[in-house]
């Protein structure tokens, strides 16, 4: 129930942000690796909200999949990030962003920080705090959190429209 309250809060927050004028939204899909007291593969979808290239907001939903205590497990994850780069008028300086965010699952909440290269490749780390006594296959999901993600903007797959 607490997990649902967090999802509703973040949804209202980002809907309110989207209601502001001139905000661009870019959908993405992503895949990656996460270490959280076990090894997980991750796949999901992500939306980027931006007014300019200096501050980007991302919200995503994904599934963590891996073996925990010898049993296959799938763990839903909701995530919110802010990407920052305040370099002005220098395109190559926008090749990296500092990233801060939080991910939440039914078992843990994990604040994190890291770097994003071109907004495509993310490296993050943080610390996960267990929510209540929730465990995954009898294993506590708290402690060091490491993440590597590759983002694929869906605009890559859209057909270009040419004026005739």
What does each model-identified segment do?
Residues 1-27:
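Bacterial Sec-dependent N-terminal signal peptides
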Residues 19-52:
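Short glycine/proline- and aromatic-enriched beta-strand/turn motifs that initiate or cap beta-hairpins
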Residues 25-35, 55-67, 92-107, 123-131:
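Transmembrane beta-strand segments that form the barrel wall of outer-membrane beta-barrel proteins
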Residues 31-33, 43-47, 78-84, 102, ...:
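Residues on the lipid-exposed face of transmembrane beta-strands in outer-membrane beta-barrel proteins
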Residues 37-39, 67-71, 86-88, 108-110, ...:
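Gram-negative outer-membrane beta-barrel proteins
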Residues 38, 48-89:
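Detector for outer-membrane/organellar transmembrane beta-barrel domains
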Residues 52-57, 86-90, 119-125, 154-158:
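Repeated loop/turn-to-beta-strand initiation elements of outer-membrane beta-barrel proteins
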Residues 80, 141-164:
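Outer-membrane beta-barrel "beta-signal"
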């Amino acid at each position: 129930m607490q997990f649902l309250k967090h999802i509703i809060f973040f949804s209202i927050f980002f809907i309110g942000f989207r209601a502001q004028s001139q905000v661009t939204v870019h959908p993405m899909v992503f895949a990656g690796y996460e270490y959280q007291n076990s090894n997980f593969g991750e796949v999901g979808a992500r939306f980027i909200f931006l007014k300019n290239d200096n501050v980007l907001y991302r919200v995503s939903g994904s599934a963590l999949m891996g073996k925990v205590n010898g049993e296959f497990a799938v763990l839903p994850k909701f995530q919110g990030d802010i990407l920052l780069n305040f370099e002005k008028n220098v395109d190559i300086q926008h090749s990296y962003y500092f990233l801060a965010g939080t991910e939440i699952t039914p078992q843990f909440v994990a604040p994190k920080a890291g770097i994003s290269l071109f907004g495509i490749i993310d490296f993050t780390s943080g610390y996960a705090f267990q929510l209540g006594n929730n465990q995954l296959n009898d294993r506590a999901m708290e402690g060091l959190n490491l993440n590597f993600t590759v983002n694929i903007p869906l605009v890559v797959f859209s057909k270009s429209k040419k004026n005739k």
